[in-house]
Amino acid sequence: MFVSFEGIDGCGKSTQVNLLVNYLEEKGIPYIKVREPGGTHLGEKIRELLITQEMCARSELLLFLASRAQLVESVIKPALKNGKIVIADRFAHSSVAYQGCGRELGPETVKILNDFATDKTYPDIVFYIDVPVNVAMERMKNQHKDRIEKEGKEFWESIRNCYLKMAKENENFVIIDGTRTIEEIHREIVKVFNAYL
Protein backbone atom coordinates (compact mmCIF):
# COMPACT_ATOMS: atom_id res chain seq x y z
CA MET A 1 0.00 0.00 0.00
CA PHE A 2 1.19 3.49 -0.89
CA VAL A 3 0.11 6.42 1.31
CA SER A 4 0.99 10.08 0.78
CA PHE A 5 0.42 13.16 2.88
CA GLU A 6 -0.33 16.48 1.21
CA GLY A 7 -1.11 20.03 2.24
CA ILE A 8 0.22 23.55 2.20
CA ASP A 9 3.33 24.30 4.23
CA GLY A 10 2.40 24.76 7.89
CA CYS A 11 -0.56 22.34 7.80
CA GLY A 12 1.04 19.79 10.16
CA LYS A 13 1.65 17.16 7.50
CA SER A 14 5.16 16.09 8.55
CA THR A 15 4.05 15.71 12.17
CA GLN A 16 1.28 13.35 11.06
CA VAL A 17 3.67 11.40 8.80
CA ASN A 18 5.92 10.77 11.80
CA LEU A 19 3.00 9.77 14.03
CA LEU A 20 1.76 7.23 11.46
CA VAL A 21 5.30 5.85 11.11
CA ASN A 22 5.48 5.47 14.91
CA TYR A 23 2.15 3.63 14.82
CA LEU A 24 3.45 1.24 12.13
CA GLU A 25 6.60 0.63 14.20
CA GLU A 26 4.52 -0.23 17.28
CA LYS A 27 2.37 -2.65 15.26
CA GLY A 28 5.38 -4.26 13.59
CA ILE A 29 4.10 -3.40 10.12
CA PRO A 30 6.90 -3.21 7.50
CA TYR A 31 7.14 0.21 5.90
CA ILE A 32 9.45 2.78 4.40
CA LYS A 33 9.15 6.54 4.79
CA VAL A 34 10.14 8.86 1.95
CA ARG A 35 10.02 12.59 1.40
CA GLU A 36 9.80 14.85 -1.59
CA PRO A 37 11.93 16.19 -2.91
CA GLY A 38 14.54 13.74 -1.67
CA GLY A 39 14.52 10.14 -0.56
CA THR A 40 17.50 9.16 -2.73
CA HIS A 41 21.06 10.46 -3.03
CA LEU A 42 20.14 12.27 -6.25
CA GLY A 43 16.86 13.50 -4.76
CA GLU A 44 18.62 15.05 -1.76
CA LYS A 45 21.01 16.92 -4.06
CA ILE A 46 18.02 18.20 -6.04
CA ARG A 47 16.27 19.18 -2.78
CA GLU A 48 19.23 21.38 -1.86
CA LEU A 49 19.05 23.14 -5.24
CA LEU A 50 15.29 23.65 -4.98
CA ILE A 51 15.49 25.15 -1.51
CA THR A 52 18.46 27.45 -2.03
CA GLN A 53 18.66 28.50 -5.70
CA GLU A 54 16.53 31.02 -7.56
CA MET A 55 15.05 29.50 -10.72
CA CYS A 56 12.21 29.84 -13.18
CA ALA A 57 8.98 27.90 -12.63
CA ARG A 58 9.68 25.36 -15.40
CA SER A 59 13.12 24.54 -13.99
CA GLU A 60 11.57 24.11 -10.55
CA LEU A 61 8.97 21.68 -11.90
CA LEU A 62 11.49 19.66 -13.90
CA LEU A 63 13.77 19.28 -10.88
CA PHE A 64 10.86 18.03 -8.76
CA LEU A 65 9.98 15.56 -11.53
CA ALA A 66 13.57 14.29 -11.78
CA SER A 67 13.70 13.71 -8.02
CA ARG A 68 10.33 11.94 -8.15
CA ALA A 69 11.28 9.68 -11.07
CA GLN A 70 14.41 8.51 -9.24
CA LEU A 71 12.47 7.96 -6.00
CA VAL A 72 9.81 5.85 -7.74
CA GLU A 73 12.29 3.65 -9.62
CA SER A 74 14.87 3.10 -6.91
CA VAL A 75 12.79 3.16 -3.70
CA ILE A 76 8.99 3.14 -4.04
CA LYS A 77 8.49 0.40 -6.67
CA PRO A 78 10.94 -2.02 -4.97
CA ALA A 79 9.33 -1.40 -1.57
CA LEU A 80 5.82 -2.03 -2.89
CA LYS A 81 7.03 -5.17 -4.68
CA ASN A 82 8.43 -6.41 -1.35
CA GLY A 83 5.11 -5.87 0.42
CA LYS A 84 6.12 -2.80 2.40
CA ILE A 85 3.83 0.13 3.06
CA VAL A 86 5.22 3.33 1.56
CA ILE A 87 4.56 6.51 3.53
CA ALA A 88 5.39 9.65 1.53
CA ASP A 89 5.75 13.16 2.93
CA ARG A 90 4.49 14.74 -0.32
CA PHE A 91 4.26 13.17 -3.76
CA ALA A 92 3.00 14.01 -7.26
CA HIS A 93 -0.05 15.99 -6.12
CA SER A 94 2.32 18.57 -4.59
CA SER A 95 3.59 19.45 -8.07
CA VAL A 96 0.06 19.82 -9.41
CA ALA A 97 -0.73 22.23 -6.57
CA TYR A 98 2.57 24.10 -6.22
CA GLN A 99 3.85 24.27 -9.78
CA GLY A 100 0.60 23.69 -11.69
CA CYS A 101 -1.48 26.21 -9.73
CA GLY A 102 0.90 28.20 -7.52
CA ARG A 103 3.45 28.79 -10.31
CA GLU A 104 0.68 28.86 -12.94
CA LEU A 105 2.20 26.21 -15.21
CA GLY A 106 -1.19 24.51 -15.51
CA PRO A 107 -2.42 21.53 -13.49
CA GLU A 108 -3.17 19.44 -16.60
CA THR A 109 0.36 19.91 -17.95
CA VAL A 110 1.82 18.87 -14.60
CA LYS A 111 -0.46 15.81 -14.42
CA ILE A 112 0.82 14.60 -17.81
CA LEU A 113 4.44 15.10 -16.74
CA ASN A 114 3.74 13.35 -13.42
CA ASP A 115 2.40 10.32 -15.30
CA PHE A 116 5.71 10.12 -17.15
CA ALA A 117 7.92 10.72 -14.09
CA THR A 118 6.09 8.24 -11.86
CA ASP A 119 5.39 5.63 -14.54
CA LYS A 120 1.79 6.13 -13.33
CA THR A 121 2.68 4.95 -9.82
CA TYR A 122 0.31 6.82 -7.48
CA PRO A 123 -0.76 6.54 -3.83
CA ASP A 124 -3.69 4.36 -2.77
CA ILE A 125 -4.57 6.95 -0.12
CA VAL A 126 -3.79 10.67 -0.09
CA PHE A 127 -4.26 12.31 3.30
CA TYR A 128 -4.81 15.99 2.50
CA ILE A 129 -4.44 18.00 5.70
CA ASP A 130 -6.44 21.15 5.15
CA VAL A 131 -5.93 24.38 7.07
CA PRO A 132 -6.88 27.94 6.17
CA VAL A 133 -3.95 29.88 4.73
CA ASN A 134 -3.87 32.36 7.64
CA VAL A 135 -3.51 29.44 10.10
CA ALA A 136 -0.63 27.94 8.10
CA MET A 137 1.12 31.30 7.78
CA GLU A 138 0.77 31.92 11.52
CA ARG A 139 2.31 28.50 12.25
CA MET A 140 5.24 29.24 9.90
CA LYS A 141 5.95 32.81 10.99
CA ASN A 142 8.68 31.93 13.51
CA GLN A 143 10.33 29.26 11.36
CA HIS A 144 13.31 29.72 9.07
CA LYS A 145 11.73 29.83 5.61
CA ASP A 146 13.16 28.38 2.41
CA ARG A 147 12.70 29.93 -1.04
CA ILE A 148 9.20 28.50 -1.55
CA GLU A 149 7.95 29.07 2.01
CA LYS A 150 8.64 32.82 1.61
CA GLU A 151 5.80 33.18 -0.91
CA GLY A 152 2.81 35.42 -0.16
CA LYS A 153 -0.81 34.71 0.77
CA GLU A 154 -2.10 34.69 -2.84
CA PHE A 155 0.35 31.88 -3.73
CA TRP A 156 -0.82 29.77 -0.76
CA GLU A 157 -4.52 30.42 -1.49
CA SER A 158 -4.01 29.21 -5.07
CA ILE A 159 -2.33 26.03 -3.83
CA ARG A 160 -5.00 25.33 -1.20
CA ASN A 161 -7.79 25.80 -3.75
CA CYS A 162 -6.00 23.44 -6.13
CA TYR A 163 -5.72 20.77 -3.42
CA LEU A 164 -9.43 21.12 -2.58
CA LYS A 165 -10.30 20.72 -6.27
CA MET A 166 -8.12 17.59 -6.52
CA ALA A 167 -9.77 16.19 -3.38
CA LYS A 168 -13.21 16.54 -5.01
CA GLU A 169 -12.00 14.86 -8.21
CA ASN A 170 -10.10 11.92 -6.66
CA GLU A 171 -11.85 9.36 -4.49
CA ASN A 172 -8.57 8.26 -2.90
CA PHE A 173 -8.16 11.73 -1.32
CA VAL A 174 -9.15 11.96 2.35
CA ILE A 175 -9.63 15.53 3.58
CA ILE A 176 -8.44 15.94 7.16
CA ASP A 177 -9.33 19.04 9.19
CA GLY A 178 -5.88 20.26 10.20
CA THR A 179 -7.17 22.82 12.70
CA ARG A 180 -7.90 20.13 15.30
CA THR A 181 -5.42 18.83 17.86
CA ILE A 182 -2.50 16.71 16.73
CA GLU A 183 -3.95 13.71 18.60
CA GLU A 184 -7.43 14.07 17.05
CA ILE A 185 -5.94 14.25 13.57
CA HIS A 186 -3.73 11.21 14.22
CA ARG A 187 -6.69 9.15 15.47
CA GLU A 188 -8.68 9.92 12.31
CA ILE A 189 -5.73 9.04 10.07
CA VAL A 190 -5.17 5.71 11.86
CA LYS A 191 -8.88 4.88 11.58
CA VAL A 192 -8.92 5.54 7.82
CA PHE A 193 -5.57 3.79 7.32
CA ASN A 194 -6.75 0.64 9.13
CA ALA A 195 -9.92 0.56 7.02
CA TYR A 196 -7.72 0.36 3.89
CA LEU A 197 -5.45 -2.43 5.22
UniProtKB/Swiss-Prot annotation:
It catalyses: dTMP + ATP = dTDP + ADP. It comes from the Bacteria. InterPro entries: P-loop_NTPase, Thymidylate_kin-like_dom, Thymidylate_kinase. ATP binds at G7, I8, D9, G10, C11, G12, K13, S14. One of its GO terms (cellular component) is cytosol. Keywords: ATP-binding, Kinase, Nucleotide biosynthesis, Nucleotide-binding, Transferase. It is an enzyme of class 2 (transferase). One of its GO terms (biological process) is dUDP biosynthetic process. GO terms for molecular function: ATP binding; dTMP kinase activity. Its EC number is 2.7.4.9. HAMAP family: Thymidylate_kinase. PANTHER family: THYMIDYLATE KINASE, UMP-CMP KINASE 2, MITOCHONDRIAL. Phosphorylation of dTMP to form dTDP in both de novo and salvage pathways of dTTP synthesis. This is Thymidylate kinase. It comes from Fervidobacterium nodosum (strain ATCC 35602 / DSM 5306 / Rt17-B1).
